[in-house]
Each structure stands twice: as C-alpha cells, then as structure tokens.
Amino acid sequence: MEKCRARSPHPETGFGNGFVAVVEILFYFLRQRLYPARSMTVQDAISNLEKWKSIARSLTLLLALAAINPCAQATKISPDVDEVFDLYCYNCHDDLVQKGEVDLIALPELDQDARLELLNRIEEQVYLSQMPPKNKEQPTATEKEQLLAWVSESFAALGAKSEFREKLHEPEFGNYVDHDKLFSGEIKEMPFSPARRWLISPYIFDRKIQSIVGRAAAELEIMNPMHLPDVSGVRDYDNKIAGGDHFVTMLANANAIADHQLAIISPEKFKAAESKRAALLSRITDYESSNPNHPFLPSFREELAKLEKEIKEAKEAARKEAKIDAPFRTITTKPTPPGEAEMKAAILHQYALVYDREPNPSELAGCLKLLQESIAKVGNTQGLKRMLMAVLLQPDFLYRSELGEGPEDEYGRRRLSSREASYAIAYALTERGPDKLLKLAAQRDQLKTKQQYQKHVERLLAAPGGKILIDDRTPTARTRGYSTLQPAKLRFFREFFGYSKAYQIFKDNKRFEGATHRENRNSHEIAIRQMINEADLMVDRILERDENVFQELLTSNRFYLYHNGDNEEAQKILAERKRLLEKMAGDYQEMKPKEFWETYKLDLDVQFGINSRGKMDQDVVAEIDRRMKSIPLERELIIYPKRYTPHIRIPVRDGMMAKNRTNMFNIDHNTWSYVAEQPFEIPNRMGILTHPTWLTAHSLNTSTDPVKRGKWVREKLLAGFIPDVPISVDAAIPEDHNKTLRQRLHDKTKAESCWKCHESMNPLGYAFEMYDDFGRFRQEEELEYPEHLIIEAPDDGPYTRNTYKTMPLDTTGYLMGTGNPALDGKVKDALDLIDRLAKSDRVRQSIIRHAFRFFMGRNELLSDSQTLIAADQAYLESGGSFNAVIVSLLTSDSFMYRR
C-alpha cells in the first residue's frame, strides 16, 4: 500500500537533514520571531533591527552545524532484500559488473550522499518497473513491495526524505501512480486530501481584487503576483508557496488599494500629467535663462497654466467622486483620534471586505494595537491606511485554507468546516468566492453531508454567473479572447489538451499561405489567436450539450470557422450582406470613385480587407473595381456574425481579421463559399487532436514534432510516463535534405538506448504526420530546402507559399498500452489512432485522473481509488456527462475530508 504524504497545517515545521534542515529551521525561526500573531506584518517586523541581529547570529550557528556531517548509520541489506537482489540485480550491478556504474554490493560502504543518491535511483527504477529490463525475468508484486519497503526504511534510518517520493507530488509525475491499481477496486482505504493551505490561482486573485475595489481594479493597475507554470496540462497545484516576489508585489498592491479605499490621491494616478507638467516647466526654465524673449515662451506659460488647472480640477473631481465607506470616513474626517469602538468598527469592516469574515480575537487585538500606534505617529488617515494594508498583507489573502476544521471521524480524517467547504466549492466551479446561497449555507453550518454539497454543486453547474474572459493572454490590440459562462470546465480542457499554447509557437508568415504584410492583419499570429477562440467555442458547445463529452471532443468532425456560434445571427447578417453588396455594385456604376470610397469604405474594409484608414490611391481604386465587378458572386462571402456600425472610426473586426486562417483547414478563403450554419463537417478531421490549434501547439517553429505529439498521447490519454531526458543526450534531429522528418527522426532514435523511451512516443506521433506544422492536411511532405525549390512565390499577395519538391508520407503508427488487445496494434493514420483511443476505457479513465488533479489541486494517491472509480461510473451511467464527473469529484471523500 502506498504511503501517503503527511502534510501538517504548518509544513514549514517539518525539518529534514543537512542544508534543507537549516533552511527549514531558519524559516520556522523567522516565522516565530517575526510573526508571533497572525495580524503582524513584515512592516512591523523589519522595524526591529535587534531581531535581525539575533537571526544573523542564529543563521551563522546553524550553517556551522550543517557543515558538520557525522557518519550516518549504516544501511543494512536484509537477507530477504539480498535474496531479491541476487535473483534479479547482482548479475549486472555487483562488485564485478557495474552497468550504469551501479554497485549494489558497495551500498552499505558508501558515504551518506552517495548512498542517498543510489537509494533514490533504486526506488525510482523499481517503482516504475524499469529495472530489471523488460526482456529479463521480473520480480513479483510481493518482491517489489519488499524492496520498496526496505528503501523507505533506509531513508528513515538516515533521517532523510526520498527525492523520488517527493517529486511524485509534482504535476508531471502524476502518472507514476499505478493506473491499474487505481481502477481495480482492490484499494479499500478511505480517501482524503492532506490538510493544506493552497495558493490561489491568478484567476481567483483577479476576482478577489474586483470584489474589493470593483471596476477600479484596472485603473489602480493592480499587479497579479500569481503565476502558473507555462505547460500543457493541469497547472494549478497546491504545492506552491508564496515567496519574496509575491510580497513585494502585494506591498505595492496593498498601498494602491488602501489609497483607493480612503480616496487618497496617489501620485501614480496623475503620473503622466505630472510628467508632462515637469517637462514643460523645465523647458520654460531653460528658455527663461537662455532667451527670456523667446517667442514660444508666452504659449508655453499659457499651456502650463492650463495643464496645472486641469490637474487641480481632476484631483478635486476625484476627491468628490470618491466614496469612502462609513467606518473609514468616521476616522478620516475626525479632527481628534478615534475611540476604540470606532477603530474596531473599521477593522471589522476591512475584514468583511477582504476576507468575508470577522477577525479572530488575536487578529483583532493585533490590528487594534497597530491602528492605535499608527494614528499616534502619523495621524488618522495615514494610520488607518497602515491598518488597511496590514489586513491586505496577511497570508490568508493569497492562500485558500483547507485544514479540515470539522470533527474527526473514525479514520482519523477531519471534514472541511462549512465555511471551508463554501470556498472550496466556489473556487472549484466559479473561480471567485462563495455566492449568497453558499454563504448562507456556511453560516447555518449546512455543508456537512454529500447531499448538501451536491445541492450547491449542481446549482452552480446549472446556473453559472456572467461570462468570463477565459485567457487574458490571447487578446491583442487586434484580437479578442473567448468568454465563457463555464470557466472552470473550459479551462480544464484548455489545459488538458494544451491547444491554447499554439500562439506561442512562432511561424513564418510566408510559409503560412495567403499571408500579406499590409497592416499584418493576415499574419499567422493573428490567425492562430482567432483559431484558439474557435477551438474554445467548439469545446464550450460540447460541454454545454454534456453528452458523450470525451468521445465528442476526440472524434467530432464538426468544427467552427470564422464564426461566433450564433447561427441565427449569421443567417441574418449573411442576407443583409448580400443585399448590401448588390446595392454597392449598383452604386459603383453611378457614383464617382471618391464618393463611393467615402460612402462605403467601412464596408469595403470589413468585407474585403481594403484599409479604411488608408488613402484612396491607385491600388485601392483598382482593388475596388475588381471587387465590384465580381458581384454577384457564385459563392457565399465570408462574414462574421457580428454587426458593424458606420459611426465607429475603426471597425471592431474580431473574426474579420485573418480570413486566410481558413487555409489551416485546407480551405482557400479566396474561393470558399461561407457556411453560415456551424459547426460544419470538415474532411480529414476528427476532434481536437486534428484541430489546427492542437497540431500547432504540438509542433516546432518550422516543422512538425512527432515526439511531442506522441508524448502527449502517451501521457494524457494512456496514463503513461516518459522518463526525463538525460542531460547528456543531444535531442536535435540531424539535417538531411533528401529525407522526410520521420526518416530523420527514426535514424536519430533507433539506437537501443534511445528507443527504450521513444518506442512509447514515436509510433503514436508518426500517425499525425498527415498534418503539417500549421495543422494543414497533407499527403506528401515538402522538402523545404533551396535546392528543392520549384516555384518561388511573392512575399506579398493572396498566395505567398513557395512550392517545393515532395516525398511520399508514411503516416502509419502503432498503438500499445490501451489494455485492450482489440484496440492495440498497427494504425493507418491519426484518424484510425484517434478512433481507437476514443473507444478505450483507459483513455476515459486517464481523462478522469486529470480532472481529479484539476479540481483537487494535487496528484491522486492510491487511497483516492474509490473516488476515481465513482467518477468513472458517474460518467458512464450519465451518458458521458462531464457535469456528472464534477459532481462525483466535488462530493467525494477526497474533496470533503483532510488528514
């Protein structure tokens, strides 16, 4: 049985050995000396220099102690373990033969560091069944458990932690937990999650700031200190802690928020105007000293006076418009120091605003003392500001607390308190704090049973709040991001599939057929961001239907292209556009070119990409003439279901940008007859794994990447794992101008030392070679080298892609690891591979494992077996409802209990 990681509510007190112990003891010491009460802040602590001197002396002593490395207790190889080693290991790893430079016989004689390193290697190889090699006799399950137990005992005897066991809690090592054991039903242990304080996500942080300052958040330029790893997969885990960079950012944030709360006019708010004023004043001073009669001086002085007046009026207006909450205003407007009751009212109000609760006695006492001392030193307003900042700077602002404050059960687990549960449910589904009904349930202590949890989970799934921008990295000055009513669900699949990372892969616009350089509006960067929005739309609509979700995501051949999902609006606008174009064609015959340009330049911009902000030169005249003479068209023009108004100076183009993104689906936008009813079938496609965004995200800058694509399938869908690449390995694929990428990759990885890992990736990734690195379907591979150039296309215009000599593609691959012999075997191409994957129980269960990690914020343990089995059954019994999976997970013991 796997030993679960025990995490106390205060993990910083769990000391280890060596330098790690020094650091842990130091931080414990710092916490005790600098934060004796939760209400104290770093600002209070750093004022006492004597404490820092004491800390420095203690650190010197601790470092000296750490430098002393006493001889550790010998690691004994027990007779039972020695027998297992003799059966399976000594032939290659003894005093005579040391493959991989490993001598197990010498283990007891090694110094502590070398011994720990070897124990970690043994544990990892045995745990992952990588040793003995697959072609050798394997130890039984009992023998493996015997070896692993001995390794754990050896670490304990040395007073050390297993590095391998520690990294099992990192996101990239989640699949190391035995999949078959998780779903076999043999594990009967009652599920739980470790007691924890979990850093909030950047999305929760944004909503938290909005709840405090409302719409002023953007104006205040609050910086978000929360960052998630930029990887494909679940990213928000509970094993991160706040550091110095978090504190520095929050210090600036707290200052800005407190200024806003008290209507203090911050210099930052008028920084631009003040800078302009200073520059103008400097210029006037220079002129006055060098040439007092300069003709520009009067106008400069007039401009300065006008600017100073504007700044003064703006500050006055800001003061008048500012709304200070009553408990704060009582103190800031009082000519004398406030009384204790007034101070307590301000403290209670700030806690209610920031934490939606009352301070505990210790917090109240600490804040009251701080407020009294601060007001005595710097006055009412600035003293109050210090207290407001202190509350904002408490650890609770950045952490979600899930310690399990409920009663303990017979299994040693503690249920989340109703308040803890209200936040856990709200954060999981809405990325914001509890709504009114959850708050009420927490106040009444009505979040204690599965039924009570289920009631609120189902309610929030059925009636989500307003639309939320799913990713603030995707929008640019020219593009908008996708907004959804179900952020948590969409975010999970975005992270799971990783298609939203496509915009990070730089592509050459010339290779992106159809790109033009005019205003860069048809660049690949613009196109792929719009494609990400359409992939979001596809996933969002499948989630809304909530039927056979996993299979639909993997196998649907219906996609969105140049669409926002509103079919009714699309039909109306298409009919209107037809009538408009016919009118434009008629007016073109009657109007003079300049009159026509002034009348229809916005429509020409929106529909034909003729720049409405440019001048009407000869090129524009020729383009208008060509377009108007082509009406009526034999095809449907591309439209985007969004209305435009002639009253705006610059069109809000949204989807009207980058019409040439259609070519990623092998559709020529110059000849395509637009489909208003979407999603619609696109040939040679099957699900998200054939969407151009996923294919681009899992490619290189100038080529496909079978390794990356195959690794994703192995890890995300087949619950497999690929060991880390040794640092000494050169992973670059050698150039050969007369071979396909597959041939070159095979030559590079066919050696036994490489193939033992690449056999789990390459055969899966090869199947996707039917798509290029832009996601375009292909049957041949172009050899994009100068000596193979056939036609060189212009750098600008409707077609910019060069034509090269090609070679036939081999898209066959091999599927292994589904656990189903009927599905494993040779595959024809990506479509064949995906079709088989979608039928696999292991694939379904693997997606559920990742959903568990997303909603629990951690990797699964063997003790979570019953939770995962229940979620899998919920999906099957509900006809493939992802909502059913979520309800199952958020009402499970893994979610409700802590230990």
Where are these regions (language model features)?
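N-terminal secretory signal peptides that target proteins for export/translocation
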Residues: 1-54
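Bacterial N-terminal signal peptides
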Residues: 57-67
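Sequence context surrounding c-type heme c attachment/ligation sites in exported
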Residues: 71-146, 677-830, 834-838, 844, ...
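Aromatic- and Gly/Pro-enriched helix-to-coil junctions and flexible linker segments
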Residues: 72-286, 290, 302, 309-326, ...
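Soluble non-cytosolic domains of exported or imported proteins
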Residues: 79, 83, 138-142, 337-345, ...
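Short, solvent-exposed loop/turn and secondary-structure capping segments
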Residues: 94-104, 134, 159-164, 361-363, ...
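Second-shell loop/turn segments in exported
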Residues: 135, 330-337, 349-357, 371-378, ...
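Extended surface/linker regions that mediate inter-domain or inter-protein docking
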Residues: 150, 162-164, 170-316, 337, ...
